[in-house]
């Protein structure tokens, strides 16, 4: 018996907006609605190809993303916003302009930032019941 696993890869534009769950009013499949006065952390990866792999679990099929992404160096006051894995929603766009939302309020992405000398590292881990692509 073979276990076939297909990995989907999609190129995302070089702007990602990261919201902590506590900043959000609502999240739909195509829109992130922040609470009044809340703004996301915006990061700029050089190039971003997200890899999504299906994972069959006892509870059903999940789509997993586990990546560390180099991003432009953040100001120190922004880099410390995610020092440990933090439940978050990530919003970006693919190259056709369609919004890509990673994480849901029920299954948020776990996000943290690792400071480095030249570039910071954005660590993302998420399992979703529906593919964001």
Can you name each region flagged by the protein language model?
Residues 2-68, 107-115:
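Solvent-exposed edge beta-strands and adjacent loop segments
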Residues 42-47, 91-132:
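Short beta-strand and beta-hairpin "edge-sheet" elements
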Residues 54-77, 117-130:
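Oligomerization/assembly interface segments of phage tail-like spikes and tubes
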Residues 74-98:
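Surface-exposed, low-hydrophobicity beta-strand/loop segments enriched in small/polar/acidic residues
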